[in-house]
């Protein structure tokens, strides 16, 4: 693992970083050397092709001993001033092959570009249609569920409605409008009145017992006043009865004194 890391680091430094710095110095010179600039252009062309096929080579021939070290040496060979292997590889291998197959390569590139564009348009249209149909189906499903829920709530029995109302939270109960109270049945009201009359008849005796005779009261239940007027005493417990009792007491006190 450590050896692979060091090899990759050397490839990045010696194959990319240092050549990029040398190319920068060549471009920024006051008097640009065309041959040197052409050399670095050829180097970056070879490096791009090597980077494109490097993964395939790593998969098939990475088992060779000193494979990573050979890559580092090859990159140094390409740009080293005394060897300048870039010119040799470019002039002897790459340039003849590209000159022979340049038109065919251009045609293949144009065909691939057209096929890629057709492929993109085809799948874009399919995905757009599928997405539109899926969106419409989703809206239809939501609408059907809402209609079904409203129909089920309308056909729900009153008992289940009461259960659902009891299951609501206090906030929901406060927000709900008060429902009108149903009138009580007439039979239940009559039975309640009868039971109330029975309870009151058991609790009191009617007619009430007659009080003991007092002075000034005759056998007919009338009170003889000072003027000899008979005042009937037929409402027990009323204020008039209390006033008559006080009057009797005062008369009874005054008679012995006389």
Curated annotation (Swiss-Prot):
Similarity remark: Belongs to the DP1 family.
InterPro entries reported in the protein's UniProt record: TB2_DP1_HVA22
Ranges of Polar residues composition bias in the record: 156-169
Region (Disordered): 153-258
Protein name, entry field: HVA22-like protein j
Biased composition annotated in UniProt, kind: Pro residues: 206-215
Gene name of this polypeptide: HVA22J
Organism: Arabidopsis thaliana
């Amino acid at each position: 693992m450590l050896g692979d890391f060091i090899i990759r680091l050397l490839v990045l430094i010696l194959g990319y970083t240092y050549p990029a710095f040398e190319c920068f110095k060549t471009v920024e010179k006051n008097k640009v050397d065309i041959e040197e600039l052409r050399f670095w252009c050829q180097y970056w062309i070879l490096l791009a092709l090597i980077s494109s096929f490097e993964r395939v080579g790593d998969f098939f021939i990475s088992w060779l001993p000193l494979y990573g070290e050979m890559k580092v040496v090859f990159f140094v060979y390409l740009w080293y001033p005394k060897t300048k292997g870039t010119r040799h590889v470019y002039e002897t291998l790459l340039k003849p092959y590209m000159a022979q197959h340049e038109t065919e390569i251009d045609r293949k590139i144009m065909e691939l570009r057209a096929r890629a564009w057709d492929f993109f348009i085809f799948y874009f249209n399919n995905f757009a249609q599928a997405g539109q149909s899926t969106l419409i189906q989703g809206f239809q499903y939501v609408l059907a569920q809402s209609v079904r829920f409203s129909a089920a709530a309308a056909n729900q029995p009153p008992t289940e409605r009461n259960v659902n109302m009891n299951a609501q939270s206090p906030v929901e109960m406060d927000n709900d409008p008060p429902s009108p109270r149903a009138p009580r049945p007439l039979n239940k009201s009559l039975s309640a009145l009868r039971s109330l009359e029975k309870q009151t008849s058991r609790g009191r005796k009617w007619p009430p017992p007659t009080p003991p005779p007092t002075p000034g009261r005759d056998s007919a239940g009338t009170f003889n006043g000072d003027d000899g007027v008979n005042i009937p005493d037929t409402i027990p417990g009323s204020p008039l009865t209390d006033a008559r009792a006080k009057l009797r007491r005062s008369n009874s006190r005054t008679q012995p004194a006389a």
